[in-house]
């Protein structure tokens, strides 16, 4: 069968829904948003060209893994504020054991990782390619002599850069589960960097806003601005020849180029010149471990998500278990009676996240207890039906368990129902702002995700504990939450995730609640207004779109309400039952996001 790919920005189009029952006004209004259908595979990503790259790889006979890796490398070119070679991330995947494309001779050349688990007619596994602290890093790295945290050093200095994991992770998953040669998968990203692409309105505005940060570094200034120092305007061509050379080297030599070869040498040279901590030994020692996904039932479905050092997956499952018995359908979508217990559960869950979670390779965590039904019941009992419990009140309680902006997410479904949820990050937008001379990629500032000082907020306002202290080789706690959902019979339903720092977890939570509890279609589930609360600061961040009455009722319960700009970018895909194709949604909150579909040729 001949197939072709076409790209289309996800538009929030009104749906007539003729003859369809409308259970209530809110749900009827929400269903105006419709996902993009595909009779084949689909890719939803934060940038349209990168999504189109993934769809083109599906057309070439690639599976969901091939498409996800191709899109991720393309994002390193077209979305430099978040896509990267110099950062890290997580992914969760599921592939069927048999099918037209999801399995192939290339993918069968190695045994399944022992960490994989059987789900339905396939297997699922997670990959941890989070950055690691250099061996020279210690717990006092970002402290001033008076004990205060040096925020500039934690966010912008070479010491804020952790050992990157993106290249190792993407190559490892493609080698194990992909069907196409690496050179084929990486070719589109190389072409985008070498030949250039027209800058869109979002990237043009982003680069202009980041000009003070990027122009402080000579290499970044040359890479992202014109010769006269002006930012690129929409429609102007941005070429990145140094990045193209690095991508070409990786495609030819594999991970060795980045961790031991030409790129490694350039990175270590920069570290020595500027007082950074990463050494050649740190790079050569980097590994991306396979992990068993966290799993829990929810409303007749099974949710699979990322284990620590993602703090997102465990926090998400804890929230789902606390909220599952509540009759949220009866209280209604986005009502104060629904949002209040959600906020209180968020605060309790973030309290546990910040105190208890860390890198499982170095700290002991009470995960089994944290995710148990009995603990969820205890947490529910602590939620008052009509009163907000202030953060200071919760923080003063002893723990019931013992301690032991910019990111990007893409989701892919292939024709066999194979799913990949992949999230990568530099931490804040453009990371440190510094690029590696001769290599063309930005450095992350992930060391700020560690606890610089217990109780001191990081860039996202999270007050974390000793479990997440800086230590050599340790991976910082993250909020990235790539997530898959399966129907009760084990067939795949959807893949989702989001950027957004500490707001990632609550974004994914609300997409799942909107889809699985309130019955919205995937586009409506993604488009609905979002809320966020994380214990500190003691407030609810709320997007525009909730009714004034809802805000007033929340305030009457004791909540401090803060209207905030759009949160997250939950690019998601859904697999239709019985091989009927897939659906894709690019979050309308981010200009330039796209769902790109694969269809049979007419």
Each language-model region and where it sits:
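Extended C-terminal subregions enriched in glycine
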Residues: 474, 508-509, 517-565
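Active-site rim segments in enzyme catalytic domains, especially the processed small/beta chain
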Residues: 78-81, 90-99, 117, 123-126, ...
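Noncatalytic scaffold domains of N-terminal-nucleophile
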Residues: 18-52, 56, 64-253, 258-260, ...
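Internal maturation/activation junctions in enzymes
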Residues: 21, 325-426, 435-439, 454-455, ...
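Short, small/polar residue-rich loop motifs at catalytic or cofactor-binding pockets
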Residues: 290, 404-407, 429, 478-480
């Amino acid at each position: 069968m001949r197939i072709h790919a076409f790209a289309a920005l996800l538009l929030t189009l009104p749906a007539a829904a003729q003859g369809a029952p409308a259970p209530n006004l809110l749900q009827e209004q929400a269903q105006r948003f419709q996902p993009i259908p595909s009779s084949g595979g689909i890719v939803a990503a934060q940038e349209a060209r990168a999504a189109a790259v993934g769809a083109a790889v599906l057309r070439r006979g690639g599976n969901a893994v091939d498409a996800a890796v191709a899109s991720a490398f393309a994002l390193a070119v077209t979305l430099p504020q978040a896509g990267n070679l110099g950062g890290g991330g997580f992914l969760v995947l599921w592939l069927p054991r048999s099918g037209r494309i999801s399995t192939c001779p290339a993918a069968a050349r190695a045994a399944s990782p022992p960490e994989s688990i059987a789900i339905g007619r396939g297997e699922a596994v997670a990959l941890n390619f989070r950055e690691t602290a250099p061996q020279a890093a210690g717990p006092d790295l970002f402290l001033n002599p008076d004990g205060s945290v040096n925020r500039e050093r934690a966010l912008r200095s070479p010491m804020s850069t952790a050992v990157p994991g993106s290249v190792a992770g993407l190559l490892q998953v493609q080698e194990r589960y992909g069907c196409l040669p690496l050179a084929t998968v990486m070719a589109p990203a190389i072409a985008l960097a070498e030949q250039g692409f027209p800058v869109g309105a979002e990237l043009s505005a982003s680069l202009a806003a980041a000009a003070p940060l990027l122009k402080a570094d000579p290499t970044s200034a040359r890479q992202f601005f014109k010769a006269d120092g002006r930012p690129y305007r929409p429609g102007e061509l941005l070429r990145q020849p140094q990045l193209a050379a690095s991508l070409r080297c990786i495609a030819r030599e594999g991970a060795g180029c980045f961790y031991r070869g030409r790129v490694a040498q350039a990175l270590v040279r920069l570290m020595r010149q500027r007082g950074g901590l990463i050494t050649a030994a740190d790079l050569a020692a980097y590994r991306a471990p396979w992990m068993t996904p966290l799993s829990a039932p929810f409303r007749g479905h099974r949710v699979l998500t990322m284990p620590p050092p993602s703090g997102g997956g465990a926090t998400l499952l804890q929230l789902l278990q606390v909220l599952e018995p509540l009759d949220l359908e009866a209280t209604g979508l986005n009502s104060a009676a629904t949002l209040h217990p959600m906020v209180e559960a968020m605060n309790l869950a973030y309290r546990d996240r910040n105190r208890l979670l860390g890198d499982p390779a170095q700290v002991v965590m009470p995960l089994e207890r944290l995710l148990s039904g009995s603990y969820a019941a205890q947490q529910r009992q602590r939620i008052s039906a009509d009163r907000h419990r202030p953060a200071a009140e919760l923080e003063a309680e002893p723990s019931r368990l013992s301690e032991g902006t910019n990111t990007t997410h893409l989701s892919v479904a292939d024709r066999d129902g194979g799913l990949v949820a992949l999230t990568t990050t530099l931490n804040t937008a453009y990371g440190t702002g510094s690029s590696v001379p001769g290599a063309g990629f930005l450095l992350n500032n992930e060391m700020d995700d560690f606890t610089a000082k217990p109780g001191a907020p990081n860039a996202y306002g999270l007050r974390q504990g000793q479990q997440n202290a800086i230590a050599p080789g340790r991976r910082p706690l993250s909020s990235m939450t790539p997530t898959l959902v399966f129907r009760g019979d084990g067939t795949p339903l959807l893949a989702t995730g989001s950027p957004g720092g500490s707001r990632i977890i609550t974004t994914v939570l609300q997409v799942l609640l909107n889809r699985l509890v309130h019955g919205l279609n995937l586009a409506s589930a993604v488009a609905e207004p979002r809320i966020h609360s994380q214990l500190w600061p003691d407030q609810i961040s709320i997007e525009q779109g909730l009714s004034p009455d809802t805000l007033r009722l929340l305030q009457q319960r004791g909540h401090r309400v803060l209207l905030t700009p759009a949160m997250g970018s939950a690019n998601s895909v859904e697999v239709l039952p019985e091989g009927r194709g897939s659906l894709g949604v690019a979050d309308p909150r981010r200009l330039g996001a796209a769902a790109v579909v694969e269809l049979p040729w007419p």
